[in-house]
């Protein structure tokens, strides 16, 4: 009785509804995303080039002005009181100054400032400030270590080589 109300309704031109439309291409659907990504990459590249070029310019300017300080705590003391002679070039990285002038950017220590940085360092290494201030012959600051071959001179050459760590070409020839 109510079956006429529940009948499926088909459009007159059923084929028109089922006609296929071409699928959009990947580029057309993501065109704006791709363009934004390209623009962002170009901006990043430009910023990186600018940063690296400014670093190179700053480094070149620092080298020209000799602002680069090498790690040498005795650098300013080494040339203190030395007057430059005409025609003689100063070593690279050396700066002139006085021993009483404070050195900027270096840690403050209780070490006495002298014009003998090499002997001061050796004296400090040998026994501290007391040893450094004591008058010592420069040869006493250096020690020499002698090594001896522990292998007996009477044992065979191949046994001698077995006990040693390093070999020379002559040692290997003699063992043959």
Swiss-Prot record:
Induction: Expressed in the late phase of the viral replicative cycle. The chain crosses the membrane at residues 32-52. Keywords: Apoptosis, Cytoplasmic inwards viral transport, Host cytoplasm, Host cytoskeleton, Host endoplasmic reticulum, Host membrane, Host-virus interaction, Membrane, Microtubular inwards viral transport, Transmembrane, Transmembrane helix, Viral envelope protein, Virion, Virus entry into host cell. One of its GO terms (cellular component) is membrane. Residues 123-154 have a biased composition (Low complexity). Residues 142-154 are annotated as: Interaction with host DYNLL1. Belongs to the asfivirus envelope protein p54 family. Inner envelope protein involved, through its interaction with host dynein, in the intracellular microtubule-dependent transport of viral capsid toward viral factories. Seems to induce caspase-3 activation and apoptosis. Plays a role in virion morphogenesis by recruiting and transforming the host ER membranes into the precursors of the viral envelope. Involved in virus attachment to the host cell. This is Inner membrane protein p54. It comes from African swine fever virus (isolate Tick/Malawi/Lil 20-1/1983) (ASFV). The lineage of its organism: Viruses, Varidnaviria, Bamfordvirae, Nucleocytoviricota, Pokkesviricetes.
């Amino acid at each position: 009785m109510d079956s006429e109300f529940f009948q499926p309704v088909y459009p007159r031109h059923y084929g028109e509804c089922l006609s296929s439309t071409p699928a959009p291409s990947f580029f057309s659907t993501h065109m704006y995303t791709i363009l934004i990504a390209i623009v962002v990459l170009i901006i990043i590249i430009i910023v990186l080039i600018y940063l690296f070029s400014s670093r190179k310019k700053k480094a070149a300017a620092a080298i020209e002005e000799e602002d680069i300080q090498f790690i040498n705590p005795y650098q300013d003391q080494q040339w203190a009181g030395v007057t430059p002679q005409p025609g003689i070039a100063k070593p690279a990285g050396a700066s002139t100054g006085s021993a009483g002038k404070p050195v900027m950017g270096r840690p403050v220590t209780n070490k006495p400032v002298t014009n003998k940085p090499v002997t001061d360092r050796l004296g400090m290494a040998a026994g501290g400030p007391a040893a450094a201030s004591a008058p010592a012959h420069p040869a006493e600051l250096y020690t020499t270590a002698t090594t001896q071959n522990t292998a007996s001179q009477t044992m065979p050459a191949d046994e001698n080589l077995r006990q040693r760590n390093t070999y020379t070409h002559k040692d290997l020839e003699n063992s043959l």
